């Protein structure tokens, strides 16, 4: 399998995993209980409770990352060429960048630009050597909006 086919396949699979994770997070967002409502107490965070809202989000982030890594490694291993040190290094870089992006809060265009610059991610969308790994991330402050069009979406390209 040539490199272009590998890149294309890995790109679409990763894109789908992250997109599905975001959809899950939006659809299963628990309702907030007001602190001031009488008769209702907010329980402290329980690390053993898998259905606690923070815990649930965290688990699904980890699952999405792990699935992505597994898929990408499978594509590398399916190739007849032996897994070189360079390819392993590339995989590690992608993995680290993915983890950073999922936990990162990006609010404004200015912050977005600084974040791209800091992590040495591509701002040039036309070059083929840049692979769209993540697709879309919805910042926290837009999760309340009903229409997806109003939300501030951006695409991330990782050098491969």
Curated annotation (Swiss-Prot):
This protein is called Uncharacterized 20.0 kDa protein in rps12-trnP intergenic region
Domain of life of the organism in this record? Eukaryota
Organism classification: Eukaryota, Discoba, Euglenozoa, Euglenida, Spirocuta
Q: Does the keyword Plastid apply?
A: yes
**Native species of this protein?**
Euglena longa
Q: What is its main location?
A: plastid
**GO CC, any one term:** plastid
- Where located? Plastid
Q: List keywords of the entry alphabetically.
A: Plastid
